[in-house]
C-alpha cells in the first residue's frame, strides 16, 4: 500500500468514481480540514444546481467509508502550514495544510489541482489520480 496525503479535490474525485477501488491500494492521510472542505464543496455544488442533493449526500457517506487517517496534531501542522504559505506567497493556508502534512509524513500529495501540484512539486512529491496504478 502506498501512503499519500489526500487533498479535498482528490477526495471529491475518488468519491465521484463509480468504483473508488484505486483508493483501496492507498494508505490515505489528511488533515482534519479535509472533512470540512469536502462538506463545503458538496454543499456548494448542490447550491449551484450542479449535483442533486441525494448524490451529494451519497458522496458524503462514501467519505465516511474511505479509510482515511485524519491527523490531529494541529499545532505542529499549523505552524508548518503557516511557513509554507509564507514561502510560497499564499494568503490562505488551506492548501498549505495538505502540503505541510505531506512534508511531515514524507509522503506524496494526491491532488487534482494542477496549479497546486506545479506550485509545490519542488517541496514534496505530487501524484494525480491518473498516476494511480502505474
Where are these regions (language model features)?
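Short, well-structured N-terminal submotif of metal-dependent ribonuclease cores
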Residues: 1-34, 45, 50-57, 133-134
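Acidic, PIN/NYN-like endoribonuclease modules and their adjacent C-terminal/linker elements
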Residues: 3, 31, 35, 99-134
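Phosphate- and divalent-cation-binding pockets in alpha/beta enzyme and binding domains
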Residues: 14, 37, 80, 118-119
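Residue-level signal for well-ordered alpha-helical positions
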Residues: 17-18, 41, 122-123
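Glycine/charged-rich beta-loop-alpha catalytic/anionic-binding loops adjacent to active sites
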Residues: 19-24, 63, 82-83
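Active-site-proximal, substrate-binding regions of enzyme catalytic domains
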Residues: 33-71, 77-81
